[in-house]
C-alpha cells in the first residue's frame, strides 16, 4: 500500500488499483492504518537491540525472556511476529557435532547414570575434551561444567591434547570447592581419564569418578550439548585466521555463556544469576 500511495503522484489511483487488483476500500483501510503511530515501535527497537547485542544468537524465545526481564509483558508469538517483520532470525549455523574421542577403555563405573539434575552447586560435575581446527592447526578445550546450573566453572585450552591440560582444568575447579564438598566428576572413557595420575588427583580431593559406557555419548549429554552450542554460537559464526584469534573468541564466549547468555532451562537467568539467586550456601 505504501508503494501504491507513492505512485499516486505519477499515475491515476484508479489505474493503480485496477493493475494491483485491490479494492478502493481496502486501499484506504491500509492507508489509514499506515498513518497511525506504531504501537510496537519501542518494543521493536528493543528487540533489534537485544538481537544485535547477542550477535544474532537469540531466537524469539530468548528475546521474549529478555524483554520479560526488563518488565515488558509480551508473549512469544508476538515477539516471533515482530522479529519476522524486522527480518531478524537466529544466525546459528547448525552442523553435526563430533566430539574429540581418542582411545577408550573403562576404568570407573557409571555413577551418574544420566541423572543430570543437581540440587546444589558442586554436587555433580561433567567434563570432556573437544577440538577445533584452524588452517591445519588444532586447539583443544577441556572444561568442567557444574550440573546445578550448567556453568563452566573451569576450563583449559591447549594446542595438544596432553594430560597437563586436564590437570590445569582440575586445579581451577578444585579452588571452587568448600571443605565439605566432594562432587562426582563424570567423563567419557578417554585416555586422560584412565590415567593413574588423573585417578589419584581425584582421590586426593575426595572426588568420586564416574565414566560413560562405551559408545554412549548420551551418558555425557550435557557437556556434549555445551560443545555443540559453543561451536554453533561462536566457532561457526566467524572465520579465524589463526589459533590465537580462536583462543580469544572461546575465552570471550565462555564468559558470555556464564554471565550474559540467558538459559531457557534456568527460567530466563544466566548460569551465574541462577546460582546466586536460587541457592543459599550452607554456613
From Swiss-Prot:
What Pfam families would the database entry show? Answer: HTH_21 (PF13276), rve (PF00665), rve_2 (PF13333)
Q: Which residues form the Integrase catalytic domain?
A: 117-279
Q: Among the record's GO biological process terms, what is one? A: transposition
Disulfide pairs here are none
Q: What induces it?
A: A shorter open reading frame encoding a protein called DinS, encoded by a 0.4 kb mRNA encoded within the insK transcript, is repressed by LexA, induced by DNA damage.
Q: Which InterPro entries match?
A: HTH-like_dom (IPR025948), Integrase_cat-core (IPR001584), RNaseH-like_sf (IPR012337), RNaseH_sf (IPR036397), Transpos_IS3 (IPR048020), Transposase_IS3/IS150/IS904 (IPR050900)
Molecular function terms from GO:
DNA binding
What keywords sit in the KW lines? Answer: DNA recombination, DNA-binding, Transposable element, Transposition
Presence of the UniProt keyword DNA-binding in the record: yes
DNA-binding among keywords: yes
Function of the molecule = Involved in the transposition of the insertion sequence IS150.
Q: Which family does it belong to?
A: Belongs to the transposase IS3/IS150/IS904 family.
The name this protein goes by in its record: Putative transposase InsK for insertion sequence element IS150
State the organism named in the record.
Escherichia coli (strain K12)
- The primary gene name is insK
Amino acid at each position: 500500500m505504501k508503494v501504491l500511495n507513492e505512485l499516486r503522484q505519477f499515475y491515476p489511483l484508479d489505474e493503480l488499483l485496477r493493475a494491483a487488483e485491490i479494492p478502493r476500500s481496502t486501499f484506504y483501510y491500509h492507508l489509514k492504518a499506515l498513518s497511525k503511530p506504531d504501537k510496537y515501535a519501542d518494543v521493536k527497537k528493543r528487540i533489534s537491540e537485544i538481537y544485535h547485542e547477542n550477535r544474532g544468537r537469540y531466537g524469539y524465545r530468548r528475546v521474549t525472556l529478555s524483554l520479560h526481564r526488563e518488565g515488558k509483558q509480551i508473549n512469544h508469538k508476538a515477539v516471533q511476529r515482530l522479529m519476522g517483520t524486522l527480518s531478524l532470525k537466529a544466525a546459528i549455523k547448525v552442523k553435526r557435532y563430533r566430539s574429540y574421542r581418542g582411545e577408550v577403555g573403562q576404568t570407573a563405573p557409571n555413577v551418574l547414570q544420566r541423572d543430570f539434575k543437581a540440587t546444589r552447586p558442586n554436587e555433580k560435575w561433567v567434563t570432556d575434551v573437544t577440538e577445533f581446527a584452524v588452517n591445519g592447526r588444532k586447539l583443544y578445550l577441556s572444561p568442567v561444567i557444574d550440573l546445578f546450573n550448567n556453568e563452566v566453572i573451569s576450563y583449559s585450552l591447549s594446542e595438544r591434547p596432553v594430560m597437563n591440560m586436564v590437570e590445569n582444568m582440575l586445579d581451577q575447579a578444585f579452588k571452587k570447592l568448600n571443605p565439605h564438598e566432594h562432587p562426582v566428576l563424570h567423563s567419557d572413557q578417554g585416555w586422560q581419564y584412565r590415567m593413574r595420575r588423573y585417578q589419584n588427583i581425584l582421590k586426593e580431593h575426595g572426588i568420586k569418578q564416574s565414566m560413560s559406557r562405551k559408545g554412549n555419548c548420551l551418558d555425557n549429554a550435557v557437556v556434549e550439548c555445551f560443545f555443540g552450542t559453543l561451536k554453533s554460537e561462536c566457532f561457526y559464526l566467524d572465520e579465524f585466521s589463526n589459533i590465537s584469534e580462536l583462543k580469544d573468541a572461546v575465552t570471550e564466549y565462555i564468559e558470555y555463556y556464564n554471565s550474559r547468555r540467558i538459559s531457557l532451562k534456568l527460567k530466563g537467568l544466566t548460569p551465574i544469576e541462577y546460582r546466586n539467586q536460587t541457592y543459599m550456601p550452607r554456613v
